[in-house]
Amino acid sequence: MLYTDQDDPVLIDRTGRRTLAVTDPRTHCIWLAKGLHGRSLERVLLHELGHATLVSYGMLPELHRMVRPAYWTEAEEWICNLLADYGAMIFWKASDQLGYDILEWQPPYARDGIA
């Protein structure tokens, strides 16, 4: 993860829009705008980690198989927004139902890290 100024061209995404963060699959780097903090930083980071996970674990071809090419970017953004907006709640509710913190356990693939 690298922080950069909000007006840095690196924060222009593949659609040509200026964003608060960008994941670059070629360099395996997440770029975040300086000044993000609190819940905004959490949401943006979770969203970008969603992109990194899709790329690192080779999930994009599967997504592309299920979605028409015109909607590939929109579908990827939807998945990353789902993770950012509801991911923590899902784990909290599962932990509550099971009676223990499920985040204490790490699946083997999570130990390898996200490229």
Q: How would you describe each model-predicted region?
A:
Residues 43-55:
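Active-site recognition of the HExxH zinc-binding catalytic motif
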